[in-house]
Amino acid sequence: MSFVVANTEFVSGAAGNLARLGSMISAANSAAAAQTTAVAAAGADEVSAAVAALFGAHGQTYQVLSAQAAAFHSQFVQALSGGAQAYAAAEATNFGPLQPLFDVINAPTLALLNRPLIGNGADGTAANPNGQAGGLLIGNGGNGFSPAAGPGGNGGAAGLLGHGGNGGVGALGANGGAGGTGGWLFGNGGAGGNSGGGGGAGGIGGSAVLFGAGGAGGISPNGMGAGGSGGNGGLFFGNGGAGASSFLGGGGAGGRAFLFGDGGAGGAALSAGSAGRGGDAGFFYGNGGAGGSGAGGASSAHGGAGGQAGLFGNGGEGGDGGALGGNGGNGGNAQLIGNGGDGGDGGGAGAPGLGGRGGLLLGLPGANGT
């Protein structure tokens, strides 16, 4: 027996994009029809008339073919939209009969652990801002609540298989919520919530456990709080999450990988402070994450250092310093085989970053910043 898994939102979105594309092409063909189907002769002689008639015939043939292509395009979009509606209807139809079965399956674990066996965790609410944990076997963690006052709720953790919930956005002056941990066997960590500005820090991205990527840290868009650090990748495989940027505080550090995977990029510091350091790569293989930039313009922030490479991989590049005297970050080192990361450029009177060391067996050192 074969099974089909369809994301109805993606299918509907694709149908809408194709419909808009078809409308644009039809409008372009209509605009060009007058100039291409009735070409005026360059002169009164027979040769000019024959050339004009030839090009006009080509234009008319093109319009006929375009009309046929537009009809096929319209039929395809209708079929795609109908398929999305059919999948959505099937899901809605199946939900009712299957819900009692899920209730029976989840009843023992709900009674013992207050957690379902299968199913996604509920999103946070004003009364309980933290997202609920997903099912022990399969299920994503719920997203944290974004309140009008106070910190954002934390994302819920996944079970054995599933992704962690995203942290909620903090209110003015409050921190964003941390992302939830990914599934024990497979799943990505949730993204940290953004701060509401005015001093709040972005939430830390959730980490993966065995296989999966760490979640990105939350942004501190216009306050003095730091950007959230990226979550760590899974123990066996997975990239670290990217650190987030901050306006006045420091950028968040990129998450690290453990055995196989790339380190996450550090977050930028947009005005002052220091940009986030790039995450280190997995021990055996992976590239170090790039250090965050001290940004340009009226910034004195220092660039973040690049992350260290694995045994096989390249070191991360150091971030550039801000234009008003920020130091460039040092490039990350390679280990056995790989190139060192380039050092970041210093801004104004800021010192440039040093290039990372090349691999001991094979590899070039990174260039120093200027």
Swiss-Prot record:
Coiled coil: none annotated. Changing residue 64 to G: Reduces interaction with host ubiquitin. Residues 1-93 form the PE domain. InterPro entries: PE-PGRS_N, PGRS_rpt. It comes from Mycobacterium tuberculosis (strain ATCC 25618 / H37Rv). Residues 1-72 are annotated as: UBA. The keyword Secreted applies. This is Ubiquitin-binding protein Rv1468c.
